[in-house]
């Protein structure tokens, strides 16, 4: 489920690569989450693909800087929102938990199930709070629970953390 979300954020539908013949090109596309070589400044390595969109799929590919700057929405720089076009063609924000609702629900249920199996109260607390956070895009309480997880031998981090895919504003995770 997390992998599906990452594909959606990085490229879109990965089935175009699954349809490629078995071989190095297909394998490399699957490793790179798309046709761009992450180790070579995102240079395309599959014919027919141009430069990687700077905003990955966090923003509409045709959005201009001026259009984004003029977009008056306090959530536009929130790390847990996507920028999409409404039916009227205007920009709008969409929460991750709405865009990826089906995947988020499955992930949250897996975390809740795992919480019933752990013997560490701090881990259980983190897993339950993170499940709630994924469903609401409010990560503050679960981040505090993560910091309180001092008795675990695992450093368990689940959810949107890194923002390096966002080459436009550097905020979307």
Question: Where does each model-flagged region fall?
Answer:
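Well-ordered beta-sheet/strand-loop patches within structured domains
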Residues: 53-54, 135, 139-173
């Amino acid at each position: 489920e997390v992998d599906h979300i990452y594909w959606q954020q990085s490229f879109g539908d990965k089935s175009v690569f699954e349809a490629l013949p078995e071989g190095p090109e297909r394998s490399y596309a699957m490793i790179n989450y798309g046709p761009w070589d992450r180790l070579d400044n995102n240079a395309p390595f599959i014919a027919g693909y141009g430069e990687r969109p700077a905003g990955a799929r966090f923003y509409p590919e045709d959005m201009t800087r001026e259009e984004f700057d003029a977009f008056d929405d306090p959530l536009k720089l929130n790390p847990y929102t996507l920028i999409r076009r409404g039916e009227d063609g205007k920009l709008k924000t969409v929460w991750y938990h709405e865009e990826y609702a089906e995947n988020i629900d499955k992930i949250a249920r897996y975390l809740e199930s795992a919480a019933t199996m752990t013997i560490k109260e701090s881990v259980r607390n983190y897993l339950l709070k993170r499940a709630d956070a994924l469903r609401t895009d409010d990560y503050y309480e679960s981040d505090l629970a993560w910091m309180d997880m001092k008795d675990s031998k695992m450093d368990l981090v689940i959810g949107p953390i890194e923002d390096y895919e966002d080459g436009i504003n550097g905020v979307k995770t």
